[in-house]
Amino acid sequence: AFVERMNARAAELGMNDTVFKNCNGLDEDGHITSAYDVAVMSRALMQHEKIFDYTLIWIDYVRDGQTQLVNTNKLVRTYDGILGLKTGTTSAAGSCISAAAERNGMRLIAVVLGAENTKDRFSAASSLLDYGFANWKLTTPELPELPELPVTGGMVSAVSLACEAPRGVLTASGGAEIGIKLFLPENVPAPVEPGDVLGTAEVALNGDTVQSLKITAKTEAPAITFSSALQYFLACFFAAEAA
């Protein structure tokens, strides 16, 4: 039953080359995966920050301190910015690792499968991470100033806007063109409530849209009613009389 849930979750994550036959990772006919799928699984795991409390432990003790456990991921002690994650070795799969690291706010995952020995897997994983950090960077695009959006039929003429914060965009270190384009109507009808979605901001990398951010109302615009219009007229009338 648990293995069925593993396969269902793998399908949800888009791990199209993975079939789990057991939950221990040992060799079994039909028990397969790919480096890409392991990276996808690792990325999902890393969304739970608590996992690093365990993957970064080097030595621990169990059974009242009588048994010592040493992390099989040697990169925990040697690689700058390492976060984990998991090693594995079987006769069919060889020496494997999913290694994750973070530098300057950018997290990378390197997956090595089928290495001949542990030394080779750590060397290959380190080289892959080094390549990633040397050639890629995380750039957070800057939102343009948001205009006020005109309102028709409202007690106010316009509403202020807010936008979701853009996420970092992975770009080559050599430079890339990142732009943000706002898509807003000319006006919106009242009533407008704070939080109402009124448009989008499209983040583009070299012309291709990579993020779509919601633009929402920051302030409200109640609709004009007979009573509100009368109240407004009387307020203006008496203000004029007082002047």
Regions found by a protein language model. Give the residues of each.
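Short, charged, amphipathic alpha-helices and their helix-cap/turn boundaries
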Residues: 1-18
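Domain-terminus/edge residues, biased toward the C-terminal soluble/receptor-binding domains
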Residues: 15-19, 27-243
